[in-house]
């Protein structure tokens, strides 16, 4: 999500097969990102027990627990703080590599970059399958974060095969992939949490297989299918005549890239995207721990939450946003969506921490998901419309990179707030941040079509 009001992207007829492959790529990326959401507390508990008495994890958790006891915080609050730190590392890798993959795809094409990064993702899932110790799990998540920076490449490919007038509809397809991934990943994680391969084959523990290997195996299988499909069927979406130059090492630096955008509209859109992602990531960071602490939710209960979010997201981004964002305008849709998320976040904090009401929680989750759907489609359309054709990958890469930076910082901040002040305060702070993003978004320029 950025802003550039210069060269129009060429009118290229949509290629349904390529869009289908792009859709699957995004879908599987989101599965990998979200598959461990509902089992996060249980996984952390398992690793802590396994490595008790020694090792890096045991040392870190012991220090956090001593702080928790001094602050009268619960063990779940300690887990949320630690999980937030882990999530930050994953997203930090995406922040560093997203502009690199995006710019590289502008130079050599989308297809080779997608093949490389998806193969790397498959390797990360293989490591997770055999991550019987915490360091191997940590390495798998780092590699997954590096390769997960290919989201900007996939979205740039959508821009390649859609016209400017149909850009919102193309980004709606992206939104459906996000919604399905956010539905399927937690569902796989939650519904397979009880499938422990060690119960049937205990000897596999010697090879690093652990109680949570099944979700990783499923994600690995999906990733390999995706890799084979792209190898066999994906048609390059960026023709050689539309490709840009290769970037210097300095230009590939994500921090340097952020300060080399001359257009003030792009800079403002990047700021809006950073703020809204930072605020929204509070939800992803602590919802599992907050509901487990206040409502005693199990992984199966959390799976139902994520299924609800995924279904609403699919309908919103695949149907409602695709239809109404072009009519309402990208700017209005983005601001309205951010405002709705902000209001709903305050309601989520109240529903869980004060009212302890599941029906109210689901209502607020539905509203926040609708707002997020409109904001995501509208902002993705804006940044694509602002960017010149030969820099779609780079501009989208910078925008996504800022989003990943927000996701790198947000889990640690949200975990710290939850650790010190509880979930209700954390969601109220998130609400204020999101309403602030809506205020910033009101100053975005309208794109030329």
Give the positions of each predicted feature:
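Juxtamembrane intracellular "pre-TM" segments in multi-pass secondary transporters
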Residues: 5-16, 235-272, 294
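Short amphipathic helix-loop junctions that connect adjacent transmembrane helices
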Residues: 39-80, 285-302
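Helix-breaking motifs and short loop linkers at transmembrane-helix boundaries and internal kinks
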Residues: 109, 130-135, 296, 351-355
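Helix-to-loop junctions at the C-terminal end of transmembrane segments
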Residues: 97-109, 316-330, 418
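Cytoplasmic helix-loop-helix junction between adjacent transmembrane helices
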Residues: 139-178
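C-terminal membrane-cytosol helix-exit motif in multi-pass small-molecule transporters
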Residues: 220-240, 440-444
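C-terminal transmembrane helical hairpin of 12-TM major facilitator-type secondary transporters
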Residues: 331-379
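Conserved MFS/SLC helix-loop-helix module at the cytosolic interface between two early adjacent transmembrane helices
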Residues: 95-134
């Amino acid at each position: 999500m950025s802003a550039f009001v210069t060269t129009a992207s060429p009118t290229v007829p949509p290629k349904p097969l390529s869009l289908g492959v792009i859709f699957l790529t995004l879908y599987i990326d989101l599965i990998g990102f979200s598959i461990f959401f509902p089992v996060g507390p249980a996984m952390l508990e398992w690793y802590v027990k396994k490595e008790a008495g020694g090792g890096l994890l045991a040392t870190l958790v012991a220090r956090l627990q001593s702080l928790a006891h001094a602050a009268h915080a619960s063990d779940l609050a300690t887990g949320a703080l630690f999980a937030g730190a882990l999530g930050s590392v994953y997203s930090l890798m995406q922040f560093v590599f997203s502009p690199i993959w995006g710019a590289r795809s502008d130079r050599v094409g989308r297809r080779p970059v997608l093949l490389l990064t998806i193969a790397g993702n498959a390797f990360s899932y293989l490591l997770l399958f055999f991550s019987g110790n915490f360091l191997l799990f940590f390495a798998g998540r780092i590699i997954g974060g590096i390769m997960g920076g290919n989201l900007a490449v996939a979205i740039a490919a959508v821009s390649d095969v859609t016209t400017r007038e149909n850009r919102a509809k193309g980004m709606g397809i992206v939104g459906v992939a996000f919604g399905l991934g956010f539905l399927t990943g937690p569902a796989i994680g939650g519904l397979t949490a009880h499938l422990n391969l060690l119960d049937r084959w205990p000897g596999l523990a010697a090879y690093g297989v652990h109680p949570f290997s099944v979700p990783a195996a499923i994600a690995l299988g999906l990733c390999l299918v995706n890799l084979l499909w792209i190898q066999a069927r994906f048609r390059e979406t960026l023709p050689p005549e539309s490709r840009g130059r290769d970037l210097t090492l300095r230009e590939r630096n994500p921090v340097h890239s952020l300060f080399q955008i001359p257009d003030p509209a792009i800079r403002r859109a990047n700021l809006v995207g950073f703020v809204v992602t930072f605020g929204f990531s509070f939800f992803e960071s602590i919802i599992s721990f907050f509901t487990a602490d206040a409502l005693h939710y199990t992984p199966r209960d959390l799976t139902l939450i994520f299924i609800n979010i995924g279904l609403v997201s699919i309908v919103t981004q695949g149907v409602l946003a695709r239809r109404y964002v072009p009519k309402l305008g990208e700017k209005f849709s983005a601001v309205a969506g951010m405002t709705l998320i902000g209001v709903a976040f305050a309601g989520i904090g109240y529903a869980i921490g004060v009212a302890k009401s599941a029906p109210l929680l689901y209502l607020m989750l539905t509203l926040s998901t609708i707002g997020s759907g409109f904001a995501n489609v509208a902002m993705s359309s804006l940044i694509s419309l602002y960017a010149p054709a030969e820099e779609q990958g780079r501009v989208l890469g910078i925008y996504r990179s800022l989003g990943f930076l927000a996701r790198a910082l947000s889990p640690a901040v949200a975990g710290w707030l939850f650790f010190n002040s509880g979930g209700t305060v954390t969601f109220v702070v998130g609400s204020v941040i999101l309403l602030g993003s809506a205020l910033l978004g009101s100053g975005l320029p309208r794109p030329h079509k």
